[in-house]
Every structure is written in C-alpha cells, then in structure tokens.
C-alpha cells in the first residue's frame, strides 16, 4: 500500500518526508471514481515533455543571483525557463550527507542564534533546513530588501551537529532543502514556527494554538494517474525582509517540473487564523489536462464514520475529517472523509466556486485520546478563489492506508478546460489556516456523522447512518423535513429528532445496499422558514 509518507509533526524540522511517493499509487489494484455519480471524462493523450539531465557547476547560483528585484522578476525567470526543455538538475551531495539516516538527519539542527533578522526588531525570523536524507534537491534562497535581492549562501555556521553525526558539515555552498518562518504567534517574545517550505512544492502553516497537520502544494499534476504523479518543485525562493511594524511577510517562489514552470507570491499574515494570499502565474510546457490548483494533502485513518476494522485504542485518528465546499450556487456541502479499501476519486462539478477545504471539525480531545499527536489541535485549511475560476470540479482523492504516518487524502480544483501549452495562466486564492478558519458554514451545519450495522442483534448488510446537525443560535420550535437520496440500494426508516446535546437535530436512516458495491448518499434538511443548511454527502463502499 503506497501513499504519502509523513514526517511526524512532533519532529523539530516539522516537514513532510518522502512526499514524492504518491506517484506509486498506480500499484493499487483499482480506482473508484465518481463525479457526483457521473462517469469520468475521457482525457486526451498528451505528449510527454522533453527532459534533459544537466549536472551542476560547483557553487553555481542559477536563479537567486544578487541584484535588482521587483514584482515581475520571478515571473520573467519562469517564462524564460518554460521556453526551454525541462532540465533535471543534478546537484549531488557529499556521499555522507546523501546517505544520512532519519536519526542522523534530525541531528543536524539550525542554530537559533543565527536566525535571519534575529535582534533586528523584525516580527519574523527565518531558519533554513539542511540538505540530506530524503531532501536531496538544492533549493536557492535570496533575501529581498527594497529593490535588491541578495543570495543567501549556505554556511556551516548556520547549523549544529549532534553526537549522531560523525562527519564535518561541508564548507561549499551546497544550498538548502527549504526553510521555516517563525513569529510571535502564540506568546509575545517567543518566536514559534509559523510556516514551513520543504520538499517538492509542499508547504504548511499554523494558526494560533495549532500543531502541524495537513499540508498544501504549489500545484498538483496527474494525481492518482496510471502514469504516476508528477511533483513540481520550488527551485528557488525570494523572501522579503518584513517591516519592523508589519504583520506581513512576503515569499516569492519559482516552480518547475517537466510539464510547467511558474511564479508564486505568498503574502502571509499570522493570527488566530493565519491568512496566506497566493498569486500564481503558470507557463505550461505541455497541455495541462490533469492539473490541480490549490491542492491540499492530509491524513485520515479512522473515525466513527469509517474503517471500523482498525485495531487502535484511539477512537479517531485524522488530521482532517471532512471536505467542506461552498459552490457557485451558494450551496454548502459537507463530505466526511473515508479510508477506503481501494483508491477512490470523487469530483464535485461546479461553476465559479466560492470556497473549499479540508476541515478538522472534531475538536474534543476525548475523541482522539492521543497525548502526543493532539489531533484536536490540527489546523483546518479553507481555500477562497479570487476572481471567477469558471467551470471545473473540486476533486477529492482518498487512498487506502494502514498507518497514520501516510498522508492519504488530496483535494484540489481541476479546471474543466485544459491549460494550453505555451500559454500564460494566472490564478489567485486566499488560504485560511486555523482551528476555525474563515469557512462560510451554514446556519445549520453537520457536527458529527457515524455509521454501523443496522441490526445490533445479528449480522446484516443493512447500514445505519446517523448525522448530527448543529444550529448557530438558539433552538426554535420548527422541525425540519429530511430528504435522503441514494444512487443505488434502498433508503428506509428516515427519522429526524431534536438533539439538545448538540443544540440541533439528529438525522438517522438505513441503507439496504442490495447488490451495489458503491453508493453515493445525499441528505438535506428543509425548514418551514428558509435557512442555510449544509448538505451532507457520503460515499458508501463495500
């Protein structure tokens, strides 16, 4: 079973490890696919991009050369890069670093006294990550002040090595594998981690009081595709020195892969919900027909709603428990996540989506009982498109996993029309990371859902589903009417009742699958007085 291998968030460098293994999901024996119960589209065959392998010149700076810098600098570099065949850069590490074990890599730590902007009165600090272990790619970094960028060369003085490391750190400019940004997010005078860029185009952030959980990426290409996934990489970063009295830090990034080059700008504002405004320009080398914008990656092992065969003392284990969507029609949709027995892909068609994201709704420690992982503190991530994103689908990929160390959930926006080769494609969106991100939930929203066999006295194929709805504000005397639809099988015994414990209502119904192996479920509540109520969606599989 293959999925995204995670770095446990309790580790000091707080980044994804071995994030490039999702391309091997083709080893899975089957894929369940549905687009709101519609068949998958036929995708034309695309000629693969030309790839050239080129060794690096020692100490060569390719992108972040010291010199003038403005808002168009990275866009121009990306455009020039895309006009040429993709170059698979080779920046070999000294053998000792290339073969580091997990424990050895952890033993190379950034020296906090060497943090960028330390003791300069700046509300942010930056620390770099060493190359080694799984993080072999050379990442260039520059610091921008005013209209000038200065290349940040690797120096061993930035790092300390513990007793596990037996070799001296190199003196050559071998670059970095990424960096993290610190801020006084939780306590004045204490610089806690706020955001991390490391591994391919992965990054993740925290709101106040959060612990690292789900991640995002610059771009998703060919996710869960039979050819294998393509992972673009952020090759270089330009980090603007923040103003002393500002709550904003700006990061520019250069993205590259065999299929596309791109320029990104991340404007980061920490807070209870950390806001990140993303502006991106893509320059495809080939037609991008299997592209995902604003991708998020998370983990779902089990909960009350899925995979009851897991032998675990913890009631629930997940970084996110549902996909929330606010579509172009103003409909709020909640789709609980699942850990399926075979890889499955769902696509929710839309026109001009207003928002979507992977959400961690369950915030009660008692639901997890994990003193180390503290899943109740994992952030949610809400994506708000800027401008009209047109027609397309919110895509959800769920990959089977037997362990919480693997990220097995991916969501993104897939445009209906491919992005042509040789074009210039702009898009923008806002990300909100936090315990209660700026997700526009309905006045009546799902707080919990669970399923089990319908007959507690004997084995039966019939399934019982229970969905709890919570009301924002006081309860009224109104009783809603429930409507439950299924793409197959038979729905029976639909019951709606008040649930004072949740300040809302409980919907219960039974499903007789008959001979079906996959059934799409949809439940709605209708009130006498119109209210904005979340629609509950779920995919039942054998």
UniProtKB/Swiss-Prot annotation:
It holds the Pfam family MdoG. Keywords: Periplasm, Signal. Residues 1-34 form the signal peptide. One of its GO terms (cellular component) is outer membrane-bounded periplasmic space. GO terms for molecular function: carbohydrate binding; catalytic activity. Pathway: Glycan metabolism; osmoregulated periplasmic glucan (OPG) biosynthesis. It is found in: Periplasm. InterPro entries: Gal_mutarotase_sf_dom, GH-type_carb-bd, Glucan_biosyn_MdoG/MdoD, Glucan_biosyn_MdoG_C, Ig-like_fold, Ig_E-set, MdoG_OpgG. Transmembrane segments: none annotated. It comes from the Bacteria. GO terms for biological process: beta-glucan biosynthetic process. SUPFAM superfamilies: E set domains, Galactose mutarotase-like. Belongs to the OpgD/OpgG family. Involved in the biosynthesis of osmoregulated periplasmic glucans (OPGs). HAMAP family: MdoG_OpgG. This is Glucans biosynthesis protein G.
